[in-house]
């Protein structure tokens, strides 16, 4: 055998470290999942014995490699040094998650052996024990430690990373949150939802009268306007949750009584809708209340698309009731448990509205199925436990007794144990052992334990646990009455037979205790007839599985009323005191004492109102109310363990702290000034309020060893004022620092979010000069009213668009388009604010939610299931589906909106989507009839026919039409198949030139790849090449395609092809011989299509008229400027003529002195 190897390697797909160990697999053995640690050494011995027997027949050693990592534990054969690993030859022996290894044992007698017990099948209670041998026994502790560490890491990952938003197991619905109501019970009558809606409408109406506001969208007609015609809709409670029955008046329709609705809380939704401290608060009730109701595997999530956070998270265990409205069938709600501030809990009903009744039916059905599946899975995952009557329990105790004994003593214990079996079982075991002829006592003991294990495992399959028998008998007692089922009788006989094996005293005590329990059950059934107010509660507590819960739960209804009502405790005790019988039964007394174990009763020191009965009884009842009202169902198990640990206490609640006689002697010595009586001790301190429990072994020293402690010096008012000022200043400083931190965190998150959005490779790198040109255009003041030169913009777009400015440039190009086409479109949508659209419910929610996961699944911004990216995308698509009722939502829109969302904010992306759909005319191809898409496919075929005839003939030869490969190009604008950098460049050109860019890009792509397409000779390879290979373009090819698009001009051809399509369609209708009905249908379809075409032509005519009007206005401006220029020219000519006259006059004047110059006398020269 090769020496053990220890190598560490890292997986490529995860950051987990996998550790490999070279071992020898001794063997394996399937065992029961209830196998305990004392049994495991005998199982290992059996595996080794079986391995030795097989080795004699076929001496082959199994060299294996055990791979340990947090993601899985894998055992596979070791190929050896000479052979190479081949997964086809060497398949893994077993592979499981490390958390399924629930027992590991190291053989102390032979340290080179160790074994692991792996859960294989939780349903059939099967496990497999694998035994390994290591060549180096010092490595065995390291191997066991590695397996345990991997299991620990895997369990932590399961806790911290639950599959909360898994597409496979979660279903999402859009609902409108109406409000919440605190109720006093975990279940409700059928009319609860309708009553809640009426209360919501009443409150909203009263608020509307005080401050006028629009009516909420969830307002529905009240019950007086619509009679109750429908039967009760679907309502159910989660199976497996313990429930308490309602009072009779509530079941008879007393929902309007003040006892059920404890409080109405619609105004403080933003404070109480969230369960827990780590979840962000949702929006205010007057803001967006639409939520995504997500049903997972074991929980319900309420996600706010507005805040992008989880607003509510409830486990199925916390939900006790779900119901649909009777009159308001488009509403539903559920009741769940929420923790209160004082450590207790209360029940809250959440009410929601859907778009229609069918959606509510689907939600209720999904909830019911999810509850059922979760209950089944939890039952399967529940850890198996041994009861006192389990056959394997006796084997467990036997293995515990013989643990550490030598062979002879072990043999004696086994012989004693065999005497408890039947004669037939003893004879069978004796014969089987003698057949194998063991060589020594140790082998004989191993064989006996092996046969005993097989015997007890067979018995365990038919065994009924104590708790299961009690539940079965209680359910049968409800249906049959006082009759016991046959299974309970058989179980009782089995229990008596097992008890008879013990001492006579123990058996008698157990029989007497069982008789007392039976008498207690009879007292329960008798009390049903005596007290009608306790009937439903007592009948329901008989369904509880454990005795402590059965005795702790039955309380009067007034205690349930205390969960949410504001009534006085004393009034409840007075009103219900005469209904109870005067003598308290022992079971009730025990129940009262048990409740005080976990609740110290000194908190009720204020004297209540005087009751009619004795004050002692009323006080005890008051204490019991407080202890039950603050006890959650999850605390009952803790309470049972405390009760079992501490045992029964004294008569009154205050005697639960009574000490043993040794402790009392110790306390007398330690505190001689105090009496040992606990009641007097408590009376002395009754004025101090609630005291913490004192350790019974702690000495009480009131004044300390050196006298009374020194009193604290009282501070003056000035010192107190300075302390308050210092605390206030510190708090103000802390608040300012928190605000600054929040601002810094928000700015950092924005930068990270923007960087995450723009995580794609740029096609045309933008130079600094081009970036400067764009920044200059974008920073122009009043740019939305200034027309820029189209040639300059074409040149800038052709040279590249900076990625971080792309969203702003798209808005700039949209503004220039509006300035160029100053005419109102006929089909412009209503100017509804984006925030108002988000407050409504859409009927297209299912299609949108399905496509969210398909839209850019590999991009980090959209990859998170129901993350910020997907929720923002959902908001945009939902708002557009509400704005454009004709189109609604169509596949492909999610990619268009996703590209816009990557480059701008949510609201800006919605505005740009409206621009593309209405102003650019994209919405025509998304209409339900898809006629425009058919025309586009015809236009693309004609372009191929005219520009690439050989490629067109090749595609036609194999019957490949454009609809097989080009439909996604038009519906998603290449975003579903091509890289994001290329798609961004396509969007740049669409904002600049319009929708004809899609034809240019498609024609350029097919033309540039024409030689490669012509090489394929069948339909599958051609379509696969166009869909898969062609989108994986290189950067050079992409940039070449973009440059070709800027040089193409096919606008006139596209118009001609569209007219040609309509003419051919009319000719085809006229030439085909049809029957009258078919011709009628054809004519109707033609009529409808012609009407749509007429509308389109009217729209185009309106566009042309708008253009004509704009041109006429331009001509008028030019004429007016021409007249102004003519007047200016006349003025300049007059001015010129005047200037010429002035020049002539000056010339004439300058010529006159020259004529008189000879007549002038020259002065004589002067002498020196």
Swiss-Prot record:
Interacts with APPL2 (via BAR domain); interaction is dependent of TBC1D1 phosphorylation at Ser-235; interaction diminishes the phosphorylation of TBC1D1 at Thr-596, resulting in inhibition of SLC2A4/GLUT4 translocation and glucose uptake. The keyword Phosphoprotein applies. PROSITE patterns: PID, TBC_RABGAP. Residues 203-238, 532-551, 564-587, 628-658, 678-717, 1145-1168 are annotated as: Disordered. SUPFAM superfamilies: PH domain-like (SSF50729), Ypt/Rab-GAP domain of gyp1p (SSF47923). Residues 632-645, 1145-1159 have a biased composition (Basic and acidic residues). GO terms for cellular component: Golgi apparatus; nucleus. SMART domains: PTB, TBC. The gene is TBC1D1. May act as a GTPase-activating protein for Rab family protein(s). May play a role in the cell cycle and differentiation of various tissues. Involved in the trafficking and translocation of GLUT4-containing vesicles and insulin-stimulated glucose uptake into cells. Changing residue 1019 to A: Substantially reduced RabGAP GTPase hydrolysis activity. Residues 532-542 have a biased composition (Low complexity). One of its GO terms (molecular function) is GTPase activator activity. It comes from Homo sapiens (Human). Gene3D superfamilies: 1.10.10.2750, Pleckstrin-homology domain (PH domain)/Phosphotyrosine-binding domain (PTB), putative rabgap domain of human tbc1 domain family member 14 like domains, Ypt/Rab-GAP domain of gyp1p, domain 3. Transmembrane segments: none annotated. Residues 800-994 form the Rab-GAP TBC domain. The modification Phosphotyrosine is found at residue 952. Its main location: nucleus. The modification Phosphothreonine is found at residues 505, 596, 1131. Keywords: GTPase activation, Nucleus, Phosphoprotein. Residues 246-404 form the PID domain. The modification Phosphoserine is found at residues 146, 235, 237, 503, 507, 525, 527, 565-566, 570-571, 585, 614, 627, 695, 941. It is found in: Nucleus. This is TBC1 domain family member 1. Insulin-stimulated phosphorylation by AKT family kinases stimulates SLC2A4/GLUT4 translocation.
């Amino acid at each position: 055998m090769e020496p053990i190897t220890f190598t560490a390697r890292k997986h490529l797909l995860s950051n987990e470290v996998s550790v490999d160990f070279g071992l020898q697999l001794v063997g394996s053995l399937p065992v029961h999942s209830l196998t305990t640690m004392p049994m495991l050494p005998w199982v290992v011995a059996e595996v080794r014995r079986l391995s030795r027997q097989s080795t004699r027949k076929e001496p082959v050693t199994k060299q294996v490699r055990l791979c340990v990592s947090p993601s899985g534990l894998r055992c596979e054969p070791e190929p050896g040094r000479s052979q190479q690993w081949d997964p086809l030859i060497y398949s893994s022996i077993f592979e499981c998650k490390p958390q399924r290894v629930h027992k590991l044992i190291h053989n102390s007698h032979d340290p080179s052996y160790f074994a692991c017990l792996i859960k294989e099948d939780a349903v059939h209670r099967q496990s497999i024990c694998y035994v390994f041998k290591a060549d180096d026994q010092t490595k065995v502790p390291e191997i066991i430690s590695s397996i345990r560490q991997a299991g620990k890491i895997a369990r932590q990952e399961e806790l911290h990373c639950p599959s909360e938003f898994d597409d496979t197991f979660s279903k999402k619905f859009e609902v409108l949150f109406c409000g919440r109501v605190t109720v006093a019970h975990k279940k409700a009558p059928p009319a609860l939802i309708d009553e809640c809606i009426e209360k919501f409408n009443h409150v909203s109406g009263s608020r509307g009268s005080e401050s006028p506001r629009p009516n909420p969208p969830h307002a529905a007609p009240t019950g007086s306007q619509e009679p109750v015609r429908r039967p009760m809709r679907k309502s159910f409670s989660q199976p497996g949750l313990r429930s308490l029955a309602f009072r009779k008046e509530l079941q008879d329709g007393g929902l309007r009584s003040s006892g059920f609705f404890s409080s109405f809380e619609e105004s403080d939704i933003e404070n109480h809708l969230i369960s827990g401290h780590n979840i962000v608060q949702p929006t205010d009730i007057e803001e967006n209340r639409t939520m995504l109701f997500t049903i997972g595997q074991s929980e319900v999530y309420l996600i706010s698309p507005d805040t992008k956070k989880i607003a509510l998270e409830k486990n199925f265990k916390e939900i006790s009731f779900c119901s649909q409205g009777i009159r308001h069938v488009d509403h539903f709600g559920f009741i769940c448990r929420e923790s209160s501030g004082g450590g207790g809990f209360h029940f809250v009903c959440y009410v929601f509205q859907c778009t229609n009744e069918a959606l509510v039916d689907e939600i209720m059905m999904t909830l019911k199925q999810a509850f059922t599946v979760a209950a089944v899975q939890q039952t399967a995952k529940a850890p198996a436990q041994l009861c006192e009557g389990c056959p394997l329990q006796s084997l467990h105790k036997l293995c515990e007794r013989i643990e550490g004994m030598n062979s002879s003593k072990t043999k004696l214990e086994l012989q004693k144990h065999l005497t408890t079996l039947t004669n037939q079982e003893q004879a069978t075991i004796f014969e089987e052992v003698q057949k194998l002829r063991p060589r020594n006592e140790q082998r004989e003991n191993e064989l006996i334990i092996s046969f005993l294990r097989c015997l007890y495992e067979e018995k365990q399959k038919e065994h009924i646990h104590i708790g299961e028998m009690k539940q079965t008998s209680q359910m049968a007692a409800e249906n049959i009455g006082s009759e016991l089922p046959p299974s309970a009788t058989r179980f009782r006989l089995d229990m008596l037979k097992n008890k008879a094996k013990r001492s006579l005293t123990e058996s008698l005590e157990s029989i007497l205790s069982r008789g007392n329990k039976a008498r207690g059950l009879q007292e329960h059934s008798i009390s049903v007839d005596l007290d009608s107010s306790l009937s439903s509660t007592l009948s329901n507590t008989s369904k509880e599985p454990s005795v402590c819960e059965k005795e702790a739960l039955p309380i009067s209804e007034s205690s349930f009323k205390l969960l949410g009502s504001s009534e006085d405790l004393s009034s409840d005790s007075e009103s219900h005191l005469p209904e109870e019988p005067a003598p308290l039964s022992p079971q009730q007394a025990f129940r009262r004492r048990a409740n005080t174990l976990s609740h110290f009763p000194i908190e009720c020191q204020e004297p209540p109102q005087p009751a009619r009965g004795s004050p002692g009884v009323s006080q005890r009842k008051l204490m019991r109310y407080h202890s039950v009202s603050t006890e959650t169902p999850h605390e009952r198990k803790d309470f049972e363990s405390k009760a079992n640990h501490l045992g029964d206490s004294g008569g009154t609640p205050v005697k639960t702290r009574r000490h043993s006689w040794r402790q009392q002697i110790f306390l007398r010595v330690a505190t001689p000034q105090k009496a040992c009586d606990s009641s007097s001790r408590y009376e002395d301190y009754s004025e101090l309020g609630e005291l913490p429990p004192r350790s019974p072994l702690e000495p009480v020293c009131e004044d300390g060893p050196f006298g009374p402690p020194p009193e604290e010096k009282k501070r003056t008012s000035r010192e107190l004022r300075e302390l308050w000022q210092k605390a206030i200043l510190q708090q103000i400083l802390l608040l300012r620092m928190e605000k600054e931190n929040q601002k810094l965190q928000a700015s950092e998150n924005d930068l990270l979010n923007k960087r995450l959005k723009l995580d794609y490779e740029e096609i045309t790198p933008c130079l600094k000069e081009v970036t400067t040109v764009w920044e200059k255009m974008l920073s122009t003041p009043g740019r939305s009213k200034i027309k820029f030169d189209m040639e300059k913009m074409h040149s800038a777009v052709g040279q590249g668009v900076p990625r971080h400015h792309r969203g702003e440039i798209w808005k700039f190009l949209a503004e220039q388009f509006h300035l160029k086409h100053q005419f109102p479109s006929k089909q412009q949508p209503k100017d509804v604010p984006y925030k108002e659209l988000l407050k409504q419910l859409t009927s297209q929610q299912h299609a949108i939610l399905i496509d969210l996961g398909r839209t850019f699944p590999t991009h980090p911004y959209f990859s998170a299931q129901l993350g910020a990216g997907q929720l923002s995308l959902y908001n945009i698509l939902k708002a557009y589906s509400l704005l454009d009722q004709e189109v609604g939502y169509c596949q492909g829109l999610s990619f268009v909106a996703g590209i816009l969302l990557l480059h701008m904010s949510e609201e800006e992306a919605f505005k740009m989507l409206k621009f593309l759909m209405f102003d650019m005319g994209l919405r025509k191809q998304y209409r339900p009839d898809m006629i425009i898409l058919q025309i586009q496919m015809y236009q693309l075929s004609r372009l191929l026919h005219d520009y690439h005839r050989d490629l067109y003939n090749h595609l036609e030869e194999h019957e490949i039409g454009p609809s097989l490969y080009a439909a996604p190009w038009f519906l998603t604008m290449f975003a579903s198949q091509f890289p994001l950098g290329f798609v961004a460049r396509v969007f740049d050109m669409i904002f600049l030139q319009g929708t004809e860019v899609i034809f240019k890009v498609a024609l350029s792509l097919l033309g540039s790849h024409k030689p490669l397409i012509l090489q394929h000779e069948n339909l599958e390879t051609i379509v696969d090449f166009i869909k898969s290979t062609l989108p994986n373009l290189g950067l050079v090819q992409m940039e070449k395609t973009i440059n070709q698009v800027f040089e193409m001009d096919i606008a006139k051809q596209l118009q001609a092809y569209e007219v040609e399509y309509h003419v051919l369609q009319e000719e085809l209708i006229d030439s085909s011989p049809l029957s009258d009905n078919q011709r009628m249908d054809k004519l109707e379809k033609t009529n409808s299509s012609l009407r749509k075409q007429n509308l389109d032509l009217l729209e185009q005519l309106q566009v042309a008229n708008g253009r004509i009007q704009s041109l006429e206005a331009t001509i008028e401006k030019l004429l007016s400027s021409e007249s102004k220029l003519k007047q200016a020219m006349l003025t300049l000519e007059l001015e010129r003529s005047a200037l010429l006259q002035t020049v002539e006059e000056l010339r004439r004047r300058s010529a006159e002195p020259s004529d008189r110059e000879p007549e002038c006398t020259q002065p004589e020269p002067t002498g020196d």
